[in-house]
Amino acid sequence: MIAAVRGEVLDIALDHVVIEAAGVGYKVMATPATLATLRRGAEARLITAMIVREDSMTLYGFADSDARNLFLTLLGVSGIGPSIALGALAMYDGPTLRQAIGDGDVTALTRIPKVGKKTAELLVLTLRDKVGTSTSAGVASAGGHGIRGPVVEALVGLGFAQKQAEEATDKVLANEPEATTSSALRAALSMLGKK
């Protein structure tokens, strides 16, 4: 199992980064918030989880071991695969997600892409006693301007000018106030690609 990757960032995309370590380029899937902390050409270190399937071996990267452990805990729930678990961590940071599960906040959990009411209830039922809750974190609004910073940072990390990134992000959030970080980033990239 590959537990961590450290090396030069070769490429950053919407959903993954390529990090060269010991002459090998590793494609690591990650959340937009994690990707926003990386810079092309700079050295990076990600804690990883390697998921082996019949037809693929995929690395998922996280800023810290707490996020990775929460990801692996989510995978223990029936019906939750790596893409949904990563989507949950893209929607909410670790303490907020733990709080939502601990409080049984099904409404907040259904905001996660591909998670319906039954899956959200199963998450709460299965994980309520397994995840610690943070008393200081409330469930933040999934959309709105709380995602502006990570989207702008991700765009700048992809090589866009700060002003361009801010303008595109503001336009996207004005049109789609309930957008998630990943959908806002996609829309902003689409908008910037048309210029």
Swiss-Prot record:
One of its GO terms (biological process) is DNA recombination. Gene3D superfamilies: 5' to 3' exonuclease, C-terminal subdomain, DNA helicase RuvA subunit, C-terminal domain, Nucleic acid-binding proteins. It is found in: Cytoplasm. Residues 138-142 are annotated as: Flexible linker. GO terms for cellular component: cytoplasm; Holliday junction helicase complex; Holliday junction resolvase complex. Keywords: Cytoplasm, DNA damage, DNA recombination, DNA repair, DNA-binding. Its main location: cytoplasm. Residues 64-138 are annotated as: Domain II. It comes from the Bacteria. GO terms for molecular function: ATP binding; four-way junction DNA binding; four-way junction helicase activity. CDD domains: UBA_RuvA_C (cd14332). Residues 1-63 are annotated as: Domain I. Residues 143-195 are annotated as: Domain III. The keyword DNA-binding applies. Pfam families: HHH_5, RuvA_C, RuvA_N. Transmembrane segments: none annotated. The keyword DNA-binding applies. Homotetramer. Forms an RuvA(8)-RuvB(12)-Holliday junction (HJ) complex. HJ DNA is sandwiched between 2 RuvA tetramers; dsDNA enters through RuvA and exits via RuvB. An RuvB hexamer assembles on each DNA strand where it exits the tetramer. Each RuvB hexamer is contacted by two RuvA subunits (via domain III) on 2 adjacent RuvB subunits; this complex drives branch migration. In the full resolvosome a probable DNA-RuvA(4)-RuvB(12)-RuvC(2) complex forms which resolves the HJ. Belongs to the RuvA family. The RuvA-RuvB-RuvC complex processes Holliday junction (HJ) DNA during genetic recombination and DNA repair, while the RuvA-RuvB complex plays an important role in the rescue of blocked DNA replication forks via replication fork reversal (RFR). RuvA specifically binds to HJ cruciform DNA, conferring on it an open structure. The RuvB hexamer acts as an ATP-dependent pump, pulling dsDNA into and through the RuvAB complex. HJ branch migration allows RuvC to scan DNA until it finds its consensus sequence, where it cleaves and resolves the cruciform DNA. Has three domains with a flexible linker between the domains II and III and assumes an 'L' shape. Domain III is highly mobile and contacts RuvB. This is Holliday junction branch migration complex subunit RuvA. It comes from Mycolicibacterium vanbaalenii (strain DSM 7251 / JCM 13017 / BCRC 16820 / KCTC 9966 / NRRL B-24157 / PYR-1) (Mycobacterium vanbaalenii).
